[in-house]
């Protein structure tokens, strides 16, 4: 049975009040003897991600009463965290990982989840690897631009692999292009869209998607304006964007029958079923789904720090670490709170700051 089909119709909760054990059973396909429902061993359970989603999406209306609701939530949580097989530290990492992925932008959530990280450190490595791919100063501009395009296509393919309706793919592609543009750019400019040396931001490097997800077949911009996004500023001018013709989906998954327009999307999708991680570390045996992630991981063993700050000479193993460090020298604070206007150099600091606003709102609600 595929992970997708299990997710859609796999869990049968038995909430009868007089039962001594409130357990969750997994619905299996009918076996040769005609038996349909049975509990299954831990090593044959579906992906814990399925139970995590069920745990988070569970509603009070799904149970006959409060006692049954707590019992069902407890069972779903147990099937997600699996205390019978995981240590306390592993369970803690799973909870931290879930929260970390939840606070990411939607397009990055998809990217991270496709790599199936087992803890927060692996999730960070996935994102740092993406950022390095998008912003390698040692490569020609044309090659870096092409890398961004390929990665955007790859990320859109992953949305396809997870069953996103084709009508929404253009909107997702726009989100991803903005995200890749923000990750790639380190240019500073004024209100005229000029860089620090007075030159206009190159028009040919503008991303092809703008402002809204509701982009028509042809997009015309009127009077030039300044559009600021994250760390980048540039003048908006008149240009057109035409949709690509719909692509024929000719790659089929043998497990669940889903169709994909690109072979790479099918390969990524099939890892959902297989859990394949073909790239293993010879030092510690840890396996990864992508060779680029393995390269990043190996720096833990080698101590390699190829990214060096030209200001002070400090070196970093990840390009994202260098980018964050350089803000100490530049004083750059690209992360701004929309509620009060306060700016921060690190997104994590902005997140903590915004939690304070949320707490204040909650207190106001309680007082009322």
From Swiss-Prot:
Keywords: DNA-binding, Isopeptide bond, Metal-binding, Nucleus, Phosphoprotein, Repeat, Repressor, Transcription, Transcription regulation, Ubl conjugation, Zinc, Zinc-finger. Sumoylated. It comes from the Eukaryota. InterPro entries: SCAN_dom (IPR003309), SCAN_sf (IPR038269), Znf_C2H2_sf (IPR036236), Znf_C2H2_type (IPR013087). A zinc finger (C2H2-type) spans 251-273, 279-301, 307-329, 335-357. Residues 52-134 form the SCAN box domain. The modification Phosphotyrosine is found at residue 335. It is found in: Nucleus. Pfam families: SCAN (PF02023), zf-C2H2 (PF00096). CDD domains: SCAN. Disulfide bonds: none annotated. GO terms for molecular function: DNA-binding transcription activator activity, RNA polymerase II-specific; identical protein binding; RNA polymerase II cis-regulatory region sequence-specific DNA binding; sequence-specific DNA binding; zinc ion binding. PANTHER family: KRUEPPEL-LIKE TRANSCRIPTION FACTOR, ZINC FINGER PROTEIN 384. Belongs to the krueppel C2H2-type zinc-finger protein family. Transcription factor required for myelination of differentiated oligodendrocytes. Required for the conversion of oligodendrocytes from the premyelinating to the myelinating state. In the developing central nervous system (CNS), involved in the maintenance in the progenitor stage by promoting the cell cycle. Specifically binds to the 5'-TCAT-3' DNA sequence. Has transcription repressor activity in vitro. This is Zinc finger protein 24. It comes from Pongo abelii (Sumatran orangutan). The gene is ZNF24.
């Amino acid at each position: 049975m595929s992970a997708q089909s299990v997710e859609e119709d796999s869990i049968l909760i038995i909430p009868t009040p007089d039962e001594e054990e409130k357990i969750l059973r997994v619905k299996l396909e009918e076996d040769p003897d005609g038996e349909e429902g049975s509990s299954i061993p831990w090593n044959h359970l579906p992906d814990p991600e399925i139970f995590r989603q069920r745990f988070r999406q569970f509603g009070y209306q799904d149970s006959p009463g409060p006692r049954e609701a707590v019992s069902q939530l407890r069972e779903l949580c147990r099937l997600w965290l699996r205390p019978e097989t995981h240590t306390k530290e592993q369970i803690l990492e799973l909870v931290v990982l879930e929260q970390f992925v939840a606070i990411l932008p939607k397009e990055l959530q998809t990217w991270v989840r496709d790599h199936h990280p087992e803890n927060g450190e692996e999730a960070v490595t996935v994102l740092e690897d993406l950022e390095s791919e998008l912003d390698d100063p040692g490569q020609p501009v044309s090659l870096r631009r092409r890398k961004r395009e390929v990665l955007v296509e790859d990320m859109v393919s992953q949305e396809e692999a997870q069953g996103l309706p084709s009508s929404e793919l253009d909107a997702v592609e726009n989100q991803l292009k903005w995200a890749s543009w923000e990750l790639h750019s380190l240019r500073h400019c004024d209100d005229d869209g000029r860089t620090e040396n007075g030159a206009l931001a190159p028009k040919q490097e503008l991303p092809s998607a703008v402002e809204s997800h509701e982009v028509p077949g042809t997009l015309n911009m009127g009077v030039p304006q300044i559009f600021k996004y994250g760390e980048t500023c540039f003048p908006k001018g008149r240009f057109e964007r035409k949709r690509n013709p719909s692509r024929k989906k000719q790659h089929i998954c043998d497990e669940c029958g889903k169709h994909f327009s690109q072979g790479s999307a099918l390969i990524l999708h099939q890892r959902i079923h297989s859990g394949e991680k073909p790239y293993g570390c010879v030092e510690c045996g840890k396996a990864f789904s992508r060779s680029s992630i393995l390269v990043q991981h190996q720096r833990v063993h080698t101590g390699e720090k190829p990214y060096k700050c030209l200001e002070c000479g400090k070196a970093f193993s990840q390009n994202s670490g260098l980018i964050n460090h350089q803000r100490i020298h530049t004083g750059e604070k690209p992360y701004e709170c929309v509620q009060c206007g306060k700016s921060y150099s690190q997104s994590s600091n902005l997140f903590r700051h915004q939690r304070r606003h949320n707490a204040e709102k909650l207190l106001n609600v309680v007082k009322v």
